């Protein structure tokens, strides 16, 4: 009788241990992971959802703020079910290698789920850029207005002095030009066409 009772206890303990093994580990729903990109952008990835999960990434750095969202069903990947934390750590390691956490990739892939179906991949579904804060906008507008004023002053300085055009001396009709005209007339009347200039020169020379 004692042996039967002991055997019964062993079976119950074994079933309890089996139940603990079959019980899935705690999921990463609601977890936040902080990381930096290759260009030192400070980013936060927030994970939510149950079967279909969503990962929202928000980053700030180098005067810009941007965000993007990914959705997928990583539960279809069996290694994810056993260790979801390692899955997200692998994805974060890949994001750290990128200069831009949202523009550089359309899918989030973990090496532990390379053989998983396509639906298990986290695909980008939305992305955007946040506007600059008020201080940065004011500074940029002040710089723009200052540059416009500077350009206006420089244009006024350049166009302030009127351009001075050179004076054109009037053509003087002297005695020499009249002699040349008469000499050419005589040359045309008394010389061959090919000798007009020569005859005009000789006639002008003798007419003085």
UniProtKB/Swiss-Prot annotation:
Subcellular location: Secreted, Extracellular space
Presence of the UniProt keyword Signal in the record: yes
Keywords assigned: Disulfide bond, Growth factor binding, Secreted, Signal
Disulfide bonds, paired cysteine numbers: 43-59, 68-102, 77-113, 191-199
BP terms from Gene Ontology: cell-cell signaling
One Gene Ontology term, aspect cellular component: extracellular region
Stretches for region Disordered: 130-181
Molecular function via GO: growth factor binding
Superkingdom, natural source: Eukaryota
Protein name stated in the entry: Fibroblast growth factor-binding protein 2
Organism: Gallus gallus (Chicken)
């Amino acid at each position: 009788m004692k042996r039967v009772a002991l055997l019964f206890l062993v079976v119950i303990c074994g079933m309890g241990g089996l139940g603990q093994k079959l019980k899935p580990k705690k999921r990463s729903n609601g977890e936040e992971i902080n990381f930096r990109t290759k260009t030192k952008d400070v980013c936060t990835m927030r994970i939510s959802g149950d079967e279909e999960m969503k990962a929202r990434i928000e980053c700030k750095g180098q005067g810009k703020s941007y965000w993007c969202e990914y959705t997928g069903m990583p539960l279809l990947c069996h290694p994810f079910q056993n260790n979801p934390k390692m899955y997200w750590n692998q994805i974060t390691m890949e994001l750290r290698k990128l200069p831009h956490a949202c523009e550089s990739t359309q899918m989030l892939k973990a090496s532990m789920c390379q053989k998983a179906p396509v639906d298990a991949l986290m695909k980008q579904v939305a992305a955007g850029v946040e506007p600059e804060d008020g201080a940065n906008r004011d500074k940029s507008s002040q710089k723009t207005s200052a540059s416009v004023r500077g350009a206006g002053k420089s244009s006024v300085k350049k166009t302030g002095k009127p351009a001075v055009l050179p004076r054109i001396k009037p053509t003087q009709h002297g005695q020499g030009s009249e002699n040349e005209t008469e000499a050419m007339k005589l040359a045309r009347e008394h010389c061959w066409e090919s000798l007009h200039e020569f005859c005009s020169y000789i006639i002008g020379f003798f007419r003085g």
